[in-house]
């Protein structure tokens, strides 16, 4: 189970992460990653609340994934993966990171191991700092 302190709650938070964050995709998921410490200048902006209790996650599982049973099963798998990443992999995410995981159509047929591999790959790719040549 994903604790409440690790959940994105409002549509404004989802929108902020998806617009301002970096993204990386795979066959099953698209990972949007945003570090809230990058844009907060000491004043709290509406909808952009810094959370230092740990990384925060949000899930988007659309009807493209499958029927309600498949979507809920996929959501449960993704929540479990997010909880294990938040607890056991502090090197991947800092407490100021916000993550939105968007499940693609292939996520409904994927195993938990494939989903975890794709999420870790997406987090690693999205967290790399780009350098201009």
Swiss-Prot record:
InterPro entries: Ribosomal_Su5_D2-typ_SF, Ribsml_uS5_D2-typ_fold_subgr, RNase_P
Key word tRNA-binding present: no
Assigned GO CC terms: ribonuclease P complex
EC class of the enzyme, as a word: hydrolase
GO molecular function: 3'-tRNA processing endoribonuclease activity; ribonuclease P activity; tRNA binding
GO biological process: tRNA 5'-leader removal
Reaction equations catalysed: Endonucleolytic cleavage of RNA, removing 5'-extranucleotides from tRNA precursor
Protein origin, superkingdom: Bacteria
SUPFAM superfamilies per the UniProt record, alphabetical: Ribosomal protein S5 domain 2-like
Keywords: Endonuclease, Hydrolase, Nuclease, RNA-binding, tRNA processing
EC assignment: 3.1.26.5
Subunit structure: Consists of a catalytic RNA component (M1 or rnpB) and a protein subunit.
Role this protein plays: RNaseP catalyzes the removal of the 5'-leader sequence from pre-tRNA to produce the mature 5'-terminus. It can also cleave other RNA substrates such as 4.5S RNA. The protein component plays an auxiliary but essential role in vivo by binding to the 5'-leader sequence and broadening the substrate specificity of the ribozyme.
Family to which the UniProt record says this protein belongs: Belongs to the RnpA family.
Protein name: Ribonuclease P protein component
Source organism of this protein record: Corynebacterium glutamicum (strain ATCC 13032 / DSM 20300 / JCM 1318 / BCRC 11384 / CCUG 27702 / LMG 3730 / NBRC 12168 / NCIMB 10025 / NRRL B-2784 / 534)
Protein's gene: rnpA
